[in-house]
């Protein structure tokens, strides 16, 4: 086997001053340790022979230690090496002057003397020490605790760990096409937000986010919907909004099949299945799916309402509530039902309305099995079973299931009626009452009975009507007449008792129903809010207008099954049917004579008077 000549210069690496200054302390320490170990490995082969040239057996290679140029390295090695730089003329004698064992017995300190070659007049010598590790495995890996005899082996082993880590980091970095994207991603992990809004002080991790945020202050909304004209700050918001018009719902839940327009809605929906509610209120312990829900909920405890309407001064917990409220003033209803053409203030109202057409009631009570269109309806319904009424009026102490019920109730005390009809000027406590009232003017009756086809303005009226086709549980003990509701029986019994608890302050006239008093008071005020568009005639009641309109149309929807005679009013049919049945429920107290209708009894009593 040929002899190979290896010098220390072959295995040494030199840095320029500029390169050295670029290294951090850890890299300098690593450089020092590796160079010392390389030198140790070479010198440990034969300490007593000349370091200049040593020929070994044929099985070994030949090493030569010549021209130890450590001028750069000499300034950086361990202080244990008492050395200020060997020049090109230094020759190592390789004499072992002494050995000192460390206290732990882990290292051997070898003192080596190197003498400079004679120059013109003098020679000098320099002494340094070298720490050589023993055969014990002194170097332990911090990652896996594996032991090594030599530092170089440990360094190589640790490099393997680092390569594994770096491959993961590179994988992560490769998800970003450009360096700025990686920097922005790092800011997400560190929480750094260097870009601050001068208007409100809010900080952002990206300049693009800051630019979009500043549009809130400038009210700039460059992205406009061609369908409804609504404008948005971001293009992504417009894209999501357009799905309201197209009906596109690309995000489908694999568990229940429900689809969503927005990815965020889909993510939140999945928490319904998992039951995850990571955000808990410290005041009452209530938990929420969203962090923003917790923030809004905490405003209930604090009473904070940061969003105020400039038109009427009303304040709201949520910005979205203010947006919807402002549409009450502007009359804007951008969300239109494709089935019936009805328009709504917000998308959630449209979604809930569409369930009327589909009959979908996805929220079911586990106590009684009752189903609901809205999740909030189920929440309020559950309080019927539990008896919980968390919202209490400070004026009268009355408690309510929902906060909206409390707000509406408080308007009774304040007299506030913010919802005004543009047709007749009548004002209402809540928007729902106004919507139902407007159907009187439009003639709209969206709630139809499947049994007989009769339609109603309110779903409550339809519910009451449907009970007519079913059982009548409430019977009058006086005359045997049965009723669907207990309240109907109560009002009916007042006919027998003569009780009229609702009294007019103007003329002292009394009434059985509160609604009768309200309608009567319009006589004193001269108010007739229901006007016929055909002839201009006005009426106190909406029902009177409906009956009057049949005069123009000739419609007589109430037909007698006995004789086939038809009537414009249901009350006329009821009175007519008493001719066939012979029923006379109204009795004169003075003479005992019976009559078919109250007007006949009234005329008769005048004879006695």
UniProtKB/Swiss-Prot annotation:
Q: Which SUPFAM superfamilies match?
A: beta-beta-alpha zinc fingers, KRAB domain (Kruppel-associated box)
User: Sorted alphabetically, which PROSITE patterns does this protein's record hold?
Assistant: KRAB, ZINC_FINGER_C2H2_1, ZINC_FINGER_C2H2_2
Gene3D superfamilies named among the record's database cross-references: 6.10.140.140, Classic Zinc Finger
Zinc-finger ranges (C2H2-type): 139-161, 164-189, 195-217, 223-245, 251-273, 279-301, 307-329, 335-357, 363-385, 391-413, 419-441, 447-469, 474-496, 502-524, 530-552, 558-580, 586-608
Q: What is one Gene Ontology biological process annotated in the Swiss-Prot or TrEMBL record?
A: regulation of transcription by RNA polymerase II
> Which CDD domains does the UniProt entry name for this protein?
KRAB_A-box
Protein's UniProt keywords contain Repeat: yes
GO CC terms for this protein?
nucleus
Annotated InterPro entries: KRAB, KRAB_dom_sf, Znf_C2H2_sf, Znf_C2H2_type
Residue spans making up a coiled coil are none
Q: Main localization of the protein?
A: nucleus
Q: Boundaries of each KRAB domain copy?
A: 6-84
The protein's matches in Pfam families, at most eight in alphabetical order, are given as: KRAB, zf-C2H2
The answer to whether UniProt assigns keyword Zinc-finger to this entry is yes
Q: What does this protein do?
A: May be involved in transcriptional regulation.
Know the name of this protein? Zinc finger protein 571
Protein species of origin: Homo sapiens
